[in-house]
Amino acid sequence: VAGKQLGEKDERNLFPAAIRLIDEIKPKAIMIENVRGFLSAVFEDYRNGLKSQLKKLGYKTDWRLLNASDFGVPQLRPRVVIVAVRDDYVDAFDWPTALPHNPPTVGETLVDLMAAGGWRGAKKWAKGADDIGPTIVGGSKKHGGPDLGPTRARKAWATLGVEGKSLFNEAPGADFVGTPRLTTRMVARLQGFPDEWQFHGKKTTTYRQIGNAFPPPVAKAVATNLKVAMSVQKHFLVRAA
């Protein structure tokens, strides 16, 4: 929604559809991810409007900027998480706290996948990929194929020994020489997806699914605390009865 400051005209603006579904389903709690730009001053009216709509539907709303790297994901990926809890539930939700340890580096995360095709340089590469990666972006239908982002992002990937202009279909072979590219499976792992997770479609479609996704470890941390809040309410209602 806020990535290019296109607001309501952006094809990625899903808030109207979300509001419609919330009104129809009336879930106990809601969790929505958005880009960091959602918190900028230019979107103040938009934020207030969203909060007002959710209040009319019977929800208390809060949002916070969370970094995926604080929850074990090996990339920066700062994202705004919007949480709304239905009014008939006790306000027992607490935001999750960061893990006490640093996330793994790109090299630590991907060394086995880089070596899967027999590439003899995988371990050396992993030692050089000694930091977390920049934010993985999925783009939209208006943008090109599966690259790792704009020029600045590709330069950041280059410092980690990754060519970001496109993706490989498979891991480097035994005699590969040069700077490797990521596969969709590698990108999925960097995004926090378990290896057994299945994606559908060709490479570009799969990459967009992964890049536009909410990292599962962050989603789990927030959802776990929401579940606790719901349990507190249920327990409260039983005792009150």
Predicted regions and their residues:
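C-terminal target-recognition/interaction regions appended to catalytic cores
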Residues: M114-A241
